[in-house]
Amino acid sequence: MFRWYQAKLAKQPILTASVTSAVLFGSGDVLAQQVVDRKGLEKHDFARTGRMALYGGAIFGPAATTWFGFLQRNVVLKNSKATIVARVAADQCLFTPTHLTCFLTSMAIMEGSDPIEKWRNSFLPSYKANLTIWPLVQGVNFSIVPLEYRVLVVNLVSLGWNCLLSMINSGDK
């Protein structure tokens, strides 16, 4: 299975990352609804899961793949440790606020609610939660994970993170 995934990544990296992101964003929402909230299938909000999967596949997968490539090519310092710190800082100060803003506002639009209000209520809790885990994850990711697998690593860690994001987005803080 892993070799098949490697072949797909080599041949179509953005498409592969997008499909992976869609599946894992949707899975994070299923975890939020079924494991955390214990809604059961009869009360499961399938539209919410679909919105999460759509965002993961259409926005996050392509954006993260492009972003990691950009960092790899453009954030290169003389010292490898400084390079990692600079990449993590860029990721947390540039990509993360942009990603969270896109996530929160696009979810609000798809839900038919006010995107500005959603951003005002949810951005800071989401960003604070992000800072508790992602700088460390990305430090490890940028240190030891080859470029082509970085989105996969983020997606695997994101199972729990997307569960949290989905709960914050739904007001289940």
UniProtKB/Swiss-Prot annotation:
InterPro entries: Mpv17_PMP22
Cellular component GO terms held in the UniProt record: mitochondrial inner membrane
Bilayer topology term: Multi-pass membrane protein
The keyword Transmembrane helix belongs to this UniProt entry's keyword annotation: yes
Residues passing through the membrane, by range: 12-32, 52-72, 129-149, 151-171
Alphabetically ordered keywords of this record: Membrane, Mitochondrion, Mitochondrion inner membrane, Transmembrane, Transmembrane helix
Pfam family, one: Mpv17_PMP22
Compartments it resides in: Mitochondrion inner membrane
Keyword Magnesium: no
One GO-annotated biological process of the protein: ethanol metabolic process
Biological role: May be involved in cellular response to stress. Required to maintain mitochondrial DNA (mtDNA) integrity and stability.
PANTHER family with a match to the protein in the record: PEROXISOMAL MEMBRANE PROTEIN 2, PXMP2 MPV17 (PTHR11266), PROTEIN MPV17 (PTHR11266:SF17)
Family: Belongs to the peroxisomal membrane protein PXMP2/4 family.
Protein name per its UniProtKB record: Protein sym1
Organism field: Aspergillus oryzae (strain ATCC 42149 / RIB 40)
